[in-house]
Amino acid sequence: MQQDVLELFSPATAEWFTNTFGEPTDVQKAAWPAIAAGKPALVSAPTGTGKTLSAFLIFIDRLNALARAGELKEELYLIYISPLKSLAGDIRENLRRPLLGIPREEGQEEIQVGIRTGDTPQKDRQRMIKHPPHILITTPESLFLMLTSKNGRSVLKTARALIIDELHALIDTKRGAHLMLSVA
């Protein structure tokens, strides 16, 4: 089964994953085919079972493929919603491992990751409007604020996928109801 699942990825990504982690976890084996097929996926598993990579690796692989082909545009492809702004930096750090570890071809554009929370300085918010990241890490409240501004909507309109982390912590709260309205 491992071989079948890793065949969803480019050789560079599959080799990086195997060299770094060995074998995919059961969570990854179950999630990757659905995500690769563009199906909605709900990944629920204990801490340390590879949920973050199960959510991100398909998208990183596809963004790298676009970059290798010279087709990676300066626009947003993926939105990642974290329930806490304190987790946003952790997620960006977790993404550094595959983003820096998966070999790129010479001259290949780097995948850009941006964070937009209540702590993001105004100059960084303005830069994000002119030069959107490929992956945006944000909170439910910051997503809502972006949706209510013309410039924010112009950044968000190109997104092709959405990851909501820790959904169980939000679902039965006012923040969760607000988030569901934002992503509807």
Task: State what each model feature region is.
Residues 2, 8-14, 20-184:
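Conserved P-loop/Walker A NTP-binding site and adjacent catalytic elements of P-loop NTPases
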